[in-house]
Amino acid sequence: MGKICKSPTVADLSSFGSVAGDTDCKNWQFLSAPARSNSPDFTHAVQHKAVAKLFIYKTQVNKNRTVSDTKRSFYTIHTRPINSIYRRVVEELMVEMHLLSVNVDFQYDPIYALGVVTAFDRFMLGYAPEKDRISIFNGLCKALGDEPDRYKQDAQRLESLAMRLSGTDLVAWLERSTSFADTQDLQASLGAIASNPQFKYSRLFAIGLFSLLEKADLDLVKDQETRTAALKQVCAALNLPFDKVSKDLDLYRSNLEKMAQARIVLEDAIQAERKKREKRETQASASPSGEVTDSTN
């Protein structure tokens, strides 16, 4: 029975993430004594039932979670304070990811993962110390019951693909008019998105698309005309709302600029405070004998 029970937890269940760490067979009540059967058909049926039950359980758990639950989990995982302007970034991203995770139509996909990683990296640029930045990202994912490595690996895979393609080739790949042997699973995901009328579009998904285009051809996204043309092609192929995608990306770029300006202001304030501190330390270490000499002149 142990062998049958563990089989789906490694491969079949990987796309659903962990369920409160419950991969122990003793908690899968539906696997009764007959599951000890060595019949291949029976084993296959049990595995599929395990996948279905675990997916339903995870969905129910996530659906019942509140924003407060997610925040509480996050601050239990990441216990250090978050610096000034970055705190709002973290909490807004956390809320956005939470609301998606509890939406019945939402499904994780690699482009969404790239959007999450890209948004985090861009908005958290300059955060110190680096180990805290890593801890914050890990906390965001784990607070939602997901694995940060899955996000990072999927994002890195898509980035590597985009960097070896031209902008034109990438758009063709996203349209599924061009394919590559090592990306069949990714294109299957694109096909599922395009054919799903209930696909839950998100700003983070749009950021993932933008990041792909950016990695393939930076000049393409810098020019408004070529950027718009490419986005229209991709949106048409994936049945995405172009106007919504365009507005979300305009806001994304605008917010990146504002964040860059805020970092400059923050750095100026830090430098000013450092100079004041150094001045006070210099005055405090002034020679007492020098003060006496000045008073006698």
Regions found by a protein language model. Name each.
Residues 46-154, 208, 229, 235-245, ...:
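N-terminal domain-start signal
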Residues 123-127, 213-221:
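Short loop/beta submotifs within extracellular cysteine-rich repeat domains
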Residues 156-203, 210-214:
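Short, solvent-exposed interaction modules
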